[in-house]
Regions:
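Short, charged, intrinsically disordered terminal tails
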Residues: 3-12, 75-83
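N-terminal acidic leader/helix
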Residues: 4-33
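Amphipathic alpha-helical segments that form the core helices of the histone-fold
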Residues: 42-58
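Charged, alpha-helix-enriched surfaces in structured cytosolic catalytic cores
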Residues: 15, 19, 44, 62
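Short, surface-exposed loop/turn segments at secondary-structure junctions
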Residues: 35-43
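Short, compact, well-ordered microdomains
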Residues: 56-82
Length: 83
């Protein structure tokens, strides 16, 4: 999965990276039904979500729920701006 490689290739320390990945999984569980069954659409959405998770994370982040909430807000804002 490209999104997972993107997350794992980031510069964060291992503990923070685990929190980011957990936040990503929680967020994906919440929104996955909005992207249908087409593999390309799913992959694109997961990549956007991974970027959103990385954008809101900070070194030392320790709350996957906060990563989830903030990343979903970034995604929602991006979709609103796209029209």
């Amino acid at each position: 999965m490209e999104a997972r490689r993107l997350l794992e290739g980031s510069h964060y320390e291992p503990r923070t990276l685990r929190v980011i990945c957990e936040g990503f999984e929680k967020a994906w569980d919440e929104i996955s039904s909005h992207f249908g069954a087409e593999p390309r659409s799913i992959e694109e959405a997961q990549i956007r979500l991974a970027h959103a998770c990385l954008a809101v994370a900070r070194d030392g982040s320790d709350d996957p729920e906060r990563i989830k909430i903030d990343a979903l807000q970034v995604m929602a804002l991006a979709y609103r701006e796209r029209g």
